[in-house]
């Protein structure tokens, strides 16, 4: 978990999935560690220490989003990734920036609920087991003798043992479960998210407490009963307080495509709305209080990580106030041939490993020779240079094209070993890589 990991440990964890980009990894690792450091500082100074937001600048496909995605798994904290382009200035058609915090709160509630339900799982399993046994063995009526009760208890123990061993899994039973209301998606006008949420909550609450009889197998029933019993053991009010505290102290927001809302001085037209989004984001980033259905949430200590390619605009095109709220700037490098090679061989779930695993299900043994990997990396790099630089994503296209025929006829090659060397790569991709017009449409 991130709060106990040192920056170097966080970086080495990210290294398993992302090649290079050490500056960005370091910045993110330090920002995560600083959350833990801040918690160790005594009040009132702790309240004054705010996170230093990060702006990642670099072309598409070099690892900006992947760093955020992997960070989400590492960070034991509410995390949300959103596209800045989805939001519009208040009053325009589109999403209001306050929904960022509401979505983050939903994420935190879900995360906290899962964590709390794990804590009470053992108790919930016992209660679910008893409810199942009550259905399988309805209690005998008391007629004044104690012996049947003893016999009943022994039978119950026998059934409990069978239940734990799984020998009753396929038996069909009928039992009463909470009847959840079907979820309703209500579309509301922009700026009226609060009212829409209240209406949705009101409809969701109509079905509470209702029961429905359902027929199912014991195995499925056991899972549903565990969830139902765990939900009873979790205190909803306490859960809300924990989730809100978690959002306020540990929340992370990843703002992708922030360059798309930067105003370019020489272009007119829709710039008002773009600047408006930036101005709406400003109070959120510098610290404000947002109303959610779970309560008021302060954004003072939420960490914001923004990223953008900045091809058509520059970070200086953002409004000065917003620029000042992202003091840590990190430039990500374009990928070289060596980087492409490393991506294909050194990452934990590399594309080569994925294709080997997929084709092994058809008994095809796929072997990648070093010269084959090198040639693939050269072709991906070359096409990026000639056509459009889409970074590591080019490897998906190249690999898919390379193995298209093999994947299609995999059943015919069952039991064979296929070696991907430079000659194999050139045979299938050589002409495409050389011909720029073909590359533009195929690769």
Curated annotation (Swiss-Prot):
Its main location: cytoplasm. GO terms for biological process: protein unfolding; proteolysis involved in protein catabolic process. This is ATP-dependent protease ATPase subunit HslU. SMART domains: AAA, ClpB_D2-small. It is found in: Cytoplasm. A double ring-shaped homohexamer of HslV is capped on each side by a ring-shaped HslU homohexamer. The assembly of the HslU/HslV complex is dependent on binding of ATP. One of its GO terms (molecular function) is ATP binding. Pfam families: AAA, AAA_2. Keywords: ATP-binding, Chaperone, Cytoplasm, Nucleotide-binding. The gene is hslU. ATP binds at residues 19, 61-66, 256, 321, 393. Belongs to the ClpX chaperone family. HslU subfamily. ATPase subunit of a proteasome-like degradation complex; this subunit has chaperone activity. The binding of ATP and its subsequent hydrolysis by HslU are essential for unfolding of protein substrates subsequently hydrolyzed by HslV. HslU recognizes the N-terminal part of its protein substrates and unfolds these before they are guided to HslV for hydrolysis. GO terms for cellular component: HslUV protease complex.
């Amino acid at each position: 978990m991130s709060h106990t990991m040192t920056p170097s440990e966080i970086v080495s964890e990210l290294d398993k999935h992302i090649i290079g980009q050490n500056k960005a990894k370091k910045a993110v690792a330090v920002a995560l560690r600083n959350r833990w450091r801040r918690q160790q500082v005594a009040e009132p100074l702790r309240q004054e220490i705010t996170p230093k937001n990060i702006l990642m600048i670099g072309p598409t496909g070099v690892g900006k989003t992947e760093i955020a995605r992997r960070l989400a798994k590492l960070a034991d904290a509410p995390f949300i990734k959103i596209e800045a382009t989805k939001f519009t200035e208040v009053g325009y058609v589109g999403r209001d920036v306050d929904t960022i915090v509401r979505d983050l709160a939903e994420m935190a509630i879900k995360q906290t609920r899962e964590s709390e339900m794990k804590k009470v799982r053992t108790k919930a399993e016992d209660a679910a087991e008893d409810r199942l046994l009550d259905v399988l063995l309805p209690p005998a009526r008391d007629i004044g003798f104690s012996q049947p009760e003893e016999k009943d208890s022994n039978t119950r123990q026998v059934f409990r043992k069978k239940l734990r061993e799984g020998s009753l899994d396929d038996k069909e039973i009928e039992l009463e479960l909470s009847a959840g209301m079907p979820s309703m998606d209500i579309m509301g006008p922009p700026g009226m998210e609060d009212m829409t949420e209240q209406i949705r909550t009101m409809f969701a609450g109509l079905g509470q407490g209702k029961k429905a009889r359902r027929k199912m197998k014991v195995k499925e029933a056991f899972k549903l009963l565990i969830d139902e019993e765990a939900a009873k053991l979790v205190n909803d009010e306490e859960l809300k307080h924990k989730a809100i505290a978690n959002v306020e102290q540990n929340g992370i927001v990843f703002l992708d495509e922030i360059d798309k809302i930067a105003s370019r001085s020489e272009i007119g037209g829709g710039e008002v709305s773009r600047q408006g989004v930036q101005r709406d984001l400003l109070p959120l980033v510098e610290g404000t209080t947002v109303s959610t259905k779970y309560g008021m949430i302060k954004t003072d200590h939420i960490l914001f990580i923004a990223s953008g390619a900045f091809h058509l605009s520059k970070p200086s095109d953002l409004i000065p106030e917003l620029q000042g709220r992202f003091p840590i700037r990190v430039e990500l490098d374009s990928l070289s041939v060596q980087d492409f090679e490393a991506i294909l061989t050194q990452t934990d779930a590399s594309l080569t490993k994925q294709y080997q695993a997929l084709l092994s299900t058809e008994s095809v043994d796929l072997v990648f020779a070093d010269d084959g990997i090198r040639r693939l990396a050269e072709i991906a790099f070359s096409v990026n240079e000639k056509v459009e630089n889409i970074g590591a994503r080019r490897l998906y296209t190249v690999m898919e094209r390379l193995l298209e025929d093999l994947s299609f006829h995999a059943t015919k090659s069952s039991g064979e070993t296929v070696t991907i060397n430079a000659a194999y790569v050139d045979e299938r991709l050589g002409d495409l890589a050389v011909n720029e017009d073909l590359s533009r449409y195929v690769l």
